[in-house]
């Protein structure tokens, strides 16, 4: 059973997050291992496994990029284990330049420049994310896979920049 079916939701990117949260809470109550403490060992094991599946489904569906990757997996694209990489040389060069810029910001401990950098990366991410949403709506799975690969780069870059921000603020 796929995660969308488990939560009683349609298998699409745009989700009712409130319905997702409510269904998660319902499933957690229904399959919580403590409810099966007096049951047989097999029932206890099944409850633990079901609870783990529910938690994994929740984590996957609540995070937009993970949800997109999961949707791709349902359409035959396993980005988690694939050997395909981004082939867009201009994009890769841009990523290298952004990484170098982030390194320079770190060396200079320039908080103002870092703030501007984070905003720029967020805008780049948001633009690509919107493109991905359109591609998902059109079910152009190859294009979605390519965009998700690029979003991964931007997500890691954003995370690195935010970690640097925390580091600089701690001084």
Swiss-Prot record:
One of its GO terms (cellular component) is iron-sulfur cluster transfer complex. Pfam families: HSCB_C. Keywords: Chaperone. InterPro entries: DnaJ_domain (IPR001623), HscB (IPR004640), HscB_C_sf (IPR036386), HscB_oligo_C (IPR009073), J_dom_sf (IPR036869). SUPFAM superfamilies: Chaperone J-domain (SSF46565), HSC20 (HSCB), C-terminal oligomerisation domain (SSF47144). GO terms for molecular function: ATPase activator activity; protein-folding chaperone binding. SMART domains: DnaJ. GO terms for biological process: [2Fe-2S] cluster assembly; protein complex oligomerization; protein folding. Residues 2-74 form the J domain. The keyword Chaperone applies. The keyword Chaperone applies. Co-chaperone involved in the maturation of iron-sulfur cluster-containing proteins. Seems to help targeting proteins to be folded toward HscA. NCBIfam families: hscB, PRK05014.1. Belongs to the HscB family. HAMAP family: HscB. Interacts with HscA and stimulates its ATPase activity. Interacts with IscU. This is Co-chaperone protein HscB.
């Amino acid at each position: 059973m796929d995660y969308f079916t488990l939560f009683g939701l349609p298998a699409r990117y745009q989700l009712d997050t409130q319905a997702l949260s409510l269904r998660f809470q319902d499933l957690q109550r229904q399959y919580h291992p403590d409810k099966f403490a007096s049951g047989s060992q097999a029932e206890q094991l099944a409850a633990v496994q079901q609870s783990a599946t529910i938690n994994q489904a929740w984590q996957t569906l609540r995070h937009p990029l993970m949800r997109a990757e999961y949707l791709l997996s349902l359409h035959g694209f396993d980005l988690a284990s694939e050997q395909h990489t981004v082939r867009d040389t201009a994009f890769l060069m841009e990523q290298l330049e952004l990484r170098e810029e982030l390194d320079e910001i770190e060396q200079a401990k320039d908080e103002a420049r870092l703030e501007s950098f984070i905003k720029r990366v967020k805008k780049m991410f948001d633009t690509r994310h919107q493109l991905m949403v359109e591609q998902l709506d059109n079910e152009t799975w190859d294009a979605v896979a390519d965009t998700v690969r690029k979003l991964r780069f931007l997500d890691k870059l954003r995370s690195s920049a935010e970690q640097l921000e925390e580091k600089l603020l701690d001084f």
